[in-house]
From Swiss-Prot:
It is found in: Mitochondrion. One of its GO terms (molecular function) is endonuclease activity. The gene is NMAT3. Belongs to the plant nuclear intron maturase (nMat) family. This is Nuclear intron maturase 3, mitochondrial.
Length: 723
């Protein structure tokens, strides 16, 4: 209870800070909010929208968000901007929107409660599928934008999905880089069912705890009632970019599970308090003390929940019981207890977000070089040394030849000058050249122990001047000069000190290698890391099901690409990862794969493996979910239908081509629920859209092939039935 109150006070304090920091943005945009019926030509930027929403915060709640935020024309226009996919269309956004409906009239209907949601529904005959038209999509997007400002900072850090920069790749990256010493884990599995009326009431109750707005609650209930907003738990259609998924699904799922996230967060804090780290940093530096705290890790991507512990199995069982009780009693969800079982992180793999996870020693992720690799590296190093010696000998030979030529040339010029001076001082240039050569020779000489041994032996052998009876008969100046010369020879040419330094360096390298080996051995015995691997068998089954490979797993011709233009085929291939042999062919025939636009820039880029590795994990962003693209086939039609506007949201182009939608499950006559024939975890587009036709311009059909847009980004009222 104390933790809840503390988190609540922190949240209120953060809201107050955000309100105070956003007053400047609010004052600059206040002229847009004074008259809600005035004509708006520019959408709100994010900072202005935050200031507008936070202005409605008072005494721990937000009030009248629909009337004071969602219904404003500037907010609706910002929602249109988010949905707009026609950056190359003529005219500004406000003009393109006004050709379809009036933003001001729509905002007035929303404020007065006259907005008819049912009339904006697109129902498909003989099917339970109901999709929103473009006008209703704008309202849904405006509600989503406002709810995002209200809830995004309030969600737990391990809540992924439906949030900016918090997608599936980021969740997997967190598991890979942050989880240490996992011992036991379990994945919460739900029985496949739709949200029922009781779940909608619970969801609206959670929304009402933070937002006091009857109109918003009624809109959410109507969206559920009319079938536009559907939430299915236990399936594989959430957060995948399918057209049947409403834009509010992700954020409402996060709101529904937010209470569970807070409970898990409190358990993690309590576990840290129970297992404090005793000692100072000096003890850590000795390396003799191993601190292995009991940690609880959790990742939730919408309705997929993974909980990991580094403690005992009894602790994991208690944690599982507590989480399942919250889901079944407080959230009234049906948990599949058979599949929600505890597994050993070391001996068993677990499937989460389409990837296989397993706890392994660090040497599995970063294996040491094998003996064969070490021999190959030594052989390569010897080859480099031989090549370096050859280049050095060639450089000395060329330098000697060039030096003799320079000497002959200078001598010839001096003889021809007869005492006259030239305008250019060739002596200085020659002196600089030979000085630089001499410095390079001396650097090479001083770096070679063999050369120094040789010259030291030549200059010190037969030193009869060191004999006493000889030194007594010679002048003192000659003896002093000889002694000084010998000191300089010993100082600069005696390789004893250099040899000692070299031996110390070799000894240091050996000790460091032994230290690294010892550290790797200790890490393998005391530490576990997370290994993430792709389900290769499922990937092979998927590409075989689509028709990319035959029964033997070998590539086969893709006949459906025949209907595409050459440039579209190349763009289609540009978004697919290549096999090794295909990459070699692409590098060889790169000139044939370069598709340039009117400005001469490449439209499709094929990144190499080296480029991808150099980017690193942190620079890779979460891509747009386009899971339905694999099972979608668009066939270009030769139709006599009159020209239609492009089906993409707010696109004004009328030079469109009609395309027919073919879905994989309908072409193969396979039930996606049959896991033996279908790929487990692979979602599908609703079968009601099979053989529907829609007009698309050349820009947006290319975006479909490149995976930039999906059928979720088109106007649902643009689907046409052609026989």
């Amino acid at each position: 209870m104390v933790l809840r109150l503390r988190v609540h006070s922190f949240y209120n304090r953060g809201i107050s800070f955000l309100v105070s920091s956003s007053l400047r943005n609010l004052s600059t945009a206040s002229s847009l909010f004074l008259n809600s019926d005035q004509t708006i030509t520019e959408p709100l930027v994010k900072s202005e929208l935050e200031a507008l929403v936070l202005k409605q915060y008072s005494h721990g709640k937000f009030y009248s968000l629909v009337k004071n935020a969602v219904s404003l024309p500037c907010v609706l226009l910002a929602a249109c901007q988010n949905l707009s996919l026609s950056a190359n269309s003529s005219g500004d956004l406000a003009d393109r929107v006004s050709r379809r409906f009036s933003i001001e009239e729509m905002g007035r209907e929303i404020r007065e409660g006259r907005f008819d949601i049912r009339s904006c529904c697109v129902e498909f005959i003989s099917s339970s599928l109901v999709l929103p038209n473009l006008k209703l999509k704008v309202l849904i997007e405006a509600i989503r934008m406002v709810l995002e400002i209200v809830y995004d900072d309030r969600f737990a850090t391990f809540s992924y999905g439906g949030r900016v920069g918090m997608g599936r790749h980021t969740a997997i990256r967190y598991l890979k880089n942050s989880v240490e010493n996992p011992r036991w884990w379990f994945r919460v599995s739900f029985a496949r069912e739709m949200f029922e009326e009781r779940n909608v009431d619970i969801l609206c109750g959670f929304v009402g705890e933070k937002i006091n707005d009857v109109m918003l609650i009624e809109m959410i209930k109507k969206l559920f009632e009319f079938g536009i907003l559907k939430i299915e738990l236990g399936g594989c259609n959430s957060g995948r970019g399918f057209p049947q998924e409403c834009g509010l699904c992700s954020i409402l799922i996060n709101v529904y599970f937010d209470g569970l996230d807070k409970e898990i967060q409190d358990l993690r804090l309590k576990m840290k308090v129970k297992n404090p780290r005793v000692g100072t940093g000096d003890e850590e530096s000795t390396g003799n003390v191993f601190f292995k705290p009991v940690n609880i890790y959790a990742v939730r991507y919408l309705d997929e929940i993974l909980v990991i512990t580094s403690g005992s199995k009894m602790l994991t069982m208690d944690l599982k019981k507590r989480i399942v009780d919250i889901l079944e009693q407080r959230l009234e969800l049906r948990v599949d207890r058979l599949n929600t079982s505890i597994h050993s992180a070391v001996s068993e793999k677990i499937n989460f977000l389409g990837m296989y996870l397993q706890a392994v020693p660090p040497s599995v992720l970063r294996p040491p070089k094998s003996e064969k690799a070490v021999r190959a590296m030594k052989k390569y190093q010897r080859q480099k040394d031989v090549r370096k010696l050859e280049l050095r000998n060639a450089r000395e030979r060329n330098r000697k030849t060039l030096g003799l030529k320079i000497f002959r040339h200078v001598l010839k010029k001096i003889k021809q000058s007869n005492g006259f001076k030239f305008e250019g001082e060739i002596e200085n240039e020659v002196r600089d050249i030979f000085q630089s050569w001499g410095e390079e020779v001396m650097q090479d000489f001083m770096g070679s122990l063999e050369e120094r041994w040789k010259w030291h032996w030549l200059l010190t052998r037969g030193d009869f001047l060191s004999l006493r009876h000889i030194r007594e008969k010679l002048p003192q100046d000659l003896i002093d000069a000889y002694d000084e010369f010998q000191e300089q020879v010993d100082k600069h040419l005696a390789p004893t000190q250099a040899k000692k330094v070299l031996e110390d360096e070799e000894r240091r390298v050996e000790e460091e290698e032994e230290q690294r080996y010892a550290e790797r051995t200790v890490e393998d015995l005391t530490k576990l890391c997370m290994k993430v691997s792709a389900p290769e068998e499922l990937v092979r089954k998927a590409i075989k099901l689509v028709g990319f490979t035959n029964s033997m797993g070998r590539p086969r011709p893709i006949i459906h690409l025949v209907t595409l233009e050459d440039s579209d085929i190349i763009k289609w291939y540009a978004r697919h990862e290549k096999h090794g042999s295909t990459k070699k062919l692409i590098r060889h025939y790169t000139k044939d794969l370069r598709v340039s636009d009117l400005d001469g820039r490449e439209e499709a880029h094929f990144p190499s493996e080296r480029e991808v590795k150099m980017m690193g994990d942190k620079n890779l962003s979460d891509p747009k979910p386009v899971d339905g693209t694999l099972s979608l086939l668009l066939i270009r039609l030769a139709s006599d239908e009159p020209l239609h506007h492009c089906a993409a949201s707010f696109c004004e182009r009328s030079d469109t081509i009609m395309h027919r939608v073919h879905l994989l499950q309908n072409r193969l006559h396979i039930n996606p629920l049959d896991e033996e024939k279908w790929v487990p975890g692979m979602g599908t587009i609703h079968s009601a859209l099979n053989r529907k036709c829609l007009p698309l311009c050349s820009t947006h059909i290319s975006d479909v092939y490149l995976g930039k847009i999906t059928l979720q980004d088109v106007d649902s009222s643009s689907f046409i039935d052609l026989r």
